[in-house]
Regions:
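Functional cores that coordinate and move charged inorganic groups
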Residues: 1-124
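Catalytic centers of hydrolytic enzymes
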Residues: 69, 80-354
Length: 354
């Protein structure tokens, strides 16, 4: 945290020194569901000279005044996600800074306004891919959920869902591994009951991660699970959906995960929140090795701070793109249809949270 604040302060001081009348910080830090010392509010609270902060990452819609290190108010704003709003930041002639959101762009009559040239350009791009995106790859008899079925709020970053189960199963089965891991942050959309098109699959996995299989110790498996729930009950992109494994989270135990300055896992400094970890019917043995299927983002790059997984022997290296694992699993192992096995939107009871 301190290194970040110092670097931001140096940049602000440099801008002021070069004659800037106003300093607007643009960041992708966020606030909810992340480590507090790296939040936009913490940066503001530990610096001076910033007039306004335009932030992102946590998909919040907000306009707030946040005190800086000297107690002066700084405008903090976010516009949500997926172009739900257009942000507007205005510096008035008397030096006041005002932030607002525009949720709909309309013409003089109040109708949705579209730029004809831009719409034509976008439609031209869409037409190039329309045919391939609409190819039917399988079917699901159930809604595959990334959200809580009751609240409609995103669930995959803090709870088991049937789609999370399916994605983890796809990796494990296609790699022939003991265990499958999939991060909640990598599951970007749900799939409604009906035909599954290539576009549907790409909506779930838009990043093109490659699936690998590694040899990983039981201790590293346990550490990864602990890392995945360090923020609970807040969201975490590193929340782990599992296949071939079950575990319980005791949320009454405070997280004691120790991170380095880059938010990578270092150790667990106290009691583990995860317990009752089973691989199949057997308790996890921290002293033996298992084969783990996941994507290169975790197994090779240590994404989401999963540094404990880096350096493990890679047994199958980037054999399939993540989208293909879903469709191949459905066709080869489920007979082309996702059915009763995945009917519960909250999954198959692989993750118990107390």
């Amino acid at each position: 945290g301190e290194a970040l604040y110092s670097q931001v302060q140096r940049a602000v001081d440099q801008a002021r020194g070069e004659g800037a009348d106003y300093v607007i910080m643009v960041g992708h830090l966020g606030d909810n569901g992340i480590t507090e010392k790296w939040s936009s509010r913490s940066v503001i609270a530990n610096t001076t000279g910033i007039d306004a902060a335009i932030d992102g990452h946590s998909h919040e819609v907000c306009v707030e005044n946040v005190p800086n290190e000297s107690g002066e108010m700084v405008v903090l704003t976010q516009t949500g996600t997926k172009f739900a709003n257009i942000g507007k930041l205005t510096i008035t002639t008397d030096g006041q800074i005002q932030a607002s959101h525009v949720s709909a762009v309309t013409d003089a009559e109040g109708n949705p306004a579209k730029d004809a040239e831009m719409e034509s350009f976008i439609n031209g791009i869409k037409s190039q891919y329309e045919e391939s995106l609409k190819v039917v790859l399988g079917r699901t008899d159930v809604d595959l959920m990334d959200k809580d079925p009751e609240t409609g709020l995103r669930a995959v970053r803090k709870a088991e869902t049937n789609l999370g189960d399916l994605c983890a199963d796809a990796s494990r089965y296609m790699m022939g591994a003991d265990i499958g891991f999939m991060n909640g942050g990598g599951i970007r959309a749900g799939i409604e009951a009906g035909d599954i098109t290539y576009e549907d699959a790409l909506s779930v996995f838009p990043y093109g991660n490659m699936i690998c299989m590694a040899e990983v110790s039981g201790q590293k498996i346990k550490d990864a699970l602990e890392m995945g729930v360090k923020n609970y009950p807040e969201e975490s992109g590193g929340f782990i959906h599992v296949s071939g494994l079950t575990y319980t989270v005791d949320s009454s135990v405070p997280s004691s995960v120790v991170l380095d300055e880059k938010r990578n896992f270092v150790s667990v400094g106290g009691e583990y929140r995860v317990r009752d970890i089973y691989v199949g019917e057997e308790p996890l043995d921290v002293n033996r090795t298992y084969t783990l299927a996941s994507h290169n983002y975790w197994l090779k790059s240590g994404g989401d701070g999963m540094s404990m997984l880096m350096g493990c022997p890679i047994l199958k290296d980037e054999t399939m793109v993540d989208v293909d694992t879903i469709t191949s699993y459905i066709s080869e192992y489920l007979g082309g249809t996702v059915g009763e096995e995945y009917k519960d939107p909250r999954g198959q009871g692989r993750i118990t949270i107390k």
